[in-house]
From Swiss-Prot:
Keywords: Aminoacyl-tRNA synthetase, ATP-binding, Cytoplasm, Ligase, Nucleotide-binding, Protein biosynthesis. This is Arginine--tRNA ligase. It comes from Histophilus somni (strain 2336) (Haemophilus somnus). InterPro entries: aa-tRNA-synth_I_CS, Arg-tRNA-ligase, Arg-tRNA-synth_N, Arg-tRNA-synth_N_sf, ArgRS_core, DALR_anticod-bd, Rossmann-like_a/b/a_fold, tRNAsynth_Ia_anticodon-bd. The lineage of its organism: Bacteria, Pseudomonadati, Pseudomonadota, Gammaproteobacteria, Pasteurellales. Signal peptide: none annotated. A motif ('HIGH' region) lies at residues 122-132. The gene is argS.
Amino acid sequence: MNIQSILSNKIKQAMRQAGADEQCDALVKPSSKPQFGDYQANGIMATAKKLGLNPRDFAQKVLDLIDLKNIAEKMEIAGPGFINIFLDKNWLAENIQVTLQDKKLGVTVEEIQTIVVDYSSPNVAKEMHVGHLRSTIIGDAVVRTLEFLGHNVIRANHVGDWGTQFGMLIAYLEKMENEHASAMELADLEAFYRAAKEHYDNDETFAEKARNYVVKLQNGDAYCRTMWKKLVDITMQQNQRNYDRLNVTLTQNDVMGESLYNPMLPEIVADLKAQGLAVEDEGAQVVYLEEFKNKDGDPMGVIVQKKDGGFLYTTTDIAAAKYRYHTLKADRALVFSDTRQSQHMQQAWLITRKAGYVPDSFQLEHKNFGMMLGKDGKPFKTRSGGTVKLTDLLDEAIERADKLISEKSTALSSKEKAAVIEAVGIGSVKYADLSKNRTTDYVFDWDIMLSFEGNTAPYMQYAYTRIRSIFNKTDISEEQLHPAKIQLTDEKERLLAIKLLQFEETVQIVGKEGTPHILCAYLYELAGLFSSFYEHCPILNNDNENVKLSRLKLALLTEKTLKQGLDLLGIKTVEKM
């Protein structure tokens, strides 16, 4: 159920009847203040201007033609030509009944698309660090949302599993295996990588072997491929532990690394040359783009093949876009990566389109995100200035949550307490990120994210358990509630009902824009409205049985919506706190 869509369609129909063209837009949005109604149509003035009409006169004409019988209690013209819409409480009550009976809480399945979502993307033989956190959890929240909306989602973990460094890594893995030390050494991937690099820099015999292995690997040598696969598998097994701890849905089956596209790159460069898009410049193959200018104001050159024959990330991203359209048959491809990659992605996809590798209908979308900062406003680091390992961050989250929960909860069993600590610790790290607009930088602050006040995971998780506790105090089951009729006699009930019915329009924005913070804001507002309703509208101690059952149904739908919403974010809920 999408109130915004229902109202938009009805008002657009009236606008067209009043003389507007097919492209008119009612611009219906939830009202910012109660005195402006529940929803407001803001598109009247722009359309009136096009028609050369007085906006208020046109608004009146539209108002006379709108068919919102049984949907709106009243409508009024405000200011220069806004239309304020006050929803009918009986219509709201009926739709709450329907939504409560629906497993998807009123969210209708969209026209199904195949959507590739490229996210996380760590490097092989390196441990995941905090720099991988945003892509991993924002991407996963959007994946969960798109699947909930009914789409066929293909997860693409675009891992860095190819490049000249693999000769060095294979040579060092071989050395370790000869010394029977692989299991011990590879437990610390960072140390493994550093040791390999040190040998490469200081041992010419080792370096020569490494260079030979690069060539052999690129030529498909069976031994080198086996050793390479071993490195990939060990890395991804370690990464999987992070994904599992983060409650992220990625598995090793979702790996689509750079190596997947490597065989396609020579053909792509040859084709770009044949089309006249790529030209030789100082031995390299370069595509000059008029749409981008260098500092001298000339078309910017984008290298697709170096003079030594090596390929670049741009070439790989062109191949990935082509593969996702032709092989995976996708309608959309979303890439979650740092804002600093924005120009790179724009250029790769512009070349992809100029070459005719994908049609205009294929949506290529860079869902960029800002940086995670420390309290000093600089990139988040360890106290010594090093990169924070993801596993260390999650360990600290659990430690801090343990301290917090131990101080607050004494009535939990050890099993219940462990579940709460994990849910709060990991949930706090995720929610602190997901609740921020992904395009902005944000400050990582333990004290704020672990607070039980404000837009935080602990507050949201507690709001859920608070509603669960209501049902733990009554013998009335969900089945017994089923025949009860919803009554919205109090304004607090009506406002809560409207917010509950806005779940679909919220989820659809997240799926379209890739913005989980919109869902976080919705859930926070919902929890606040429920709190206000709970304080002002007695439930279990209400003498009127019909009112009591109606309010229990509102509480039940709030509980289900909070749980479903948090699940879409990958945040666990608990029954007791």
